[in-house]
Every structure is written in structure tokens, then in C-alpha cells.
Regions:
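Short, charged, surface-exposed hinge/linker loops at domain edges
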Residues: 1-9, 46-105
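Short, positively charged
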Residues: 3-4, 11-17, 35
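Short aromatic-glycine-(Arg/Gly/Cys) micro-motifs in beta-strand/loop hairpins
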Residues: 12-29
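Short amphipathic alpha-helical segments
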Residues: 27-31, 74-76
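A short, exposed loop/beta-hairpin motif centered on an aromatic-Gly-Thr core
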Residues: 29-40
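Aromatic- and charge-enriched surface segment that lines or borders ligand/interaction sites
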Residues: 43
Length: 107
């Protein structure tokens, strides 16, 4: 599958520090675009990602797979301290749910 810029995961938010809208893209954490409007921030970043994809392909690099195109197993191994584990088990027991149900409710 050849990913295109519009297939990636974008987010636009207001930055009080910058006094402008900032667009970011999950698959390229080092890229962002700042503009006066949400629309300009997003469209500018999509154009930037398109340029980056061209550059990556020309240099033989493999672009990241868009998050929406990845497959997920539904399983996730979680490591925690013994104390955290004890607290989670106790809280789950107090709520009358399994540890798995408790942790899923927190996500």
C-alpha cells in the first residue's frame, strides 16, 4: 500500500503560547504547522507531509504506515510495580469487576 498524505492522523489545537493554531500528525511527531486558522494549519501540514513522503520515497526510505491502516490484536502487555498491581487488584475487587475491566475503563 502506498500511503498518501491524507491517510495520516492529524490533530489541530489552539496554542496560547504561539497565539495560533497548531496542526500535528501522529505518525510524524517532528512535523507541525502553525497558522492563524484551523483550516490553514491543517492544509499546510498535509502539504508538508506530502512533500516529506516524496522525499522519503526518492531517498529509498519507507514512510510510516498510517495508524488507520495498521492492524491491532486487542492485546497489550502492561508492566507495573508490585504495589501498583496490588492497588489495581484491590480497587477491582472493591468495584466488583475484573482487573481487565477496570483497566479498560481507565483507557
Amino acid at each position: 500500500m502506498k500511503a498518501t498524505a491524507d491517510m495520516y492522523t492529524y490533530r489541530v489545537f489552539w496554542s496560547g503560547e504561539d497565539g495560533a493554531f497548531v496542526a500535528s500528525v501522529s505518525e510524524f511527531p517532528s512535523l507541525s504547522n502553525i497558522a492563524d486558522s484551523q483550516k490553514e494549519a491543517l492544509s499546510g501540514l498535509i502539504e508538508l507531509v506530502a512533500d516529506v513522503l516524496v522525499d522519503m520515497r526518492e531517498s529509498g526510505e519507507q514512510p510510516p504506515v498510517p495508524l488507520g491502516c495498521r492492524t491491532y490484536s486487542g492485546k497489550y502487555a502492561l508492566r507495573m510495580t508490585p504495589e501498583q498491581h496490588r492497588r489495581v487488584v484491590m480497587e477491582a475487587a472493591e468495584q466488583g469487576v475484573s482487573v481487565n475491566q477496570l483497566l479498560i475503563s481507565r483507557v
